[in-house]
């Protein structure tokens, strides 16, 4: 019975590692409060913001805005490009819109005011599956040196998820050694 306590502790620890690295992330649009408004720093401000993040299924994006002057419309790609605010769209007018990214693909959001959308108040978010992890090969061949990558200001969630999986795998292997 004494040997089952360490095994139980390892199982609990490995489950904690797995769960803690698979949680979703909440993103505040523009990384600041009340940023869904005009004027924008540039017409491509939200495009740059979105490209600096890696969105996965289950993540949430939060639009904070003045609901007396703004709204958020979820639209298709054509209406996104043309800034069409009329039609079959999901419209949000609450000033604190939370959207769960529940499927893989591209989500398109525009301001409910066409003039604001034309000024750049629109956002396209590419969502990937968080379970698309690439496992490293068991045997690696030396790679020729490559140029240094440019610095990246945002973190990479995929690396954290991969690290969590590798840690879980290592703990599982240690547990198996105790069971055999």
Swiss-Prot record:
Lipidation (GPI-anchor amidated serine): 154
Record flagged with keyword Ribosomal protein: no
GO molecular function: electron transfer activity
Entry's Gene Ontology BP terms: nodulation
Annotated glycan sites: 67, 152
InterPro entries: Cupredoxin, Phytocyanin-like, Phytocyanin_dom
Name of the protein in question: Early nodulin-16
Organism of this sequence: Medicago truncatula
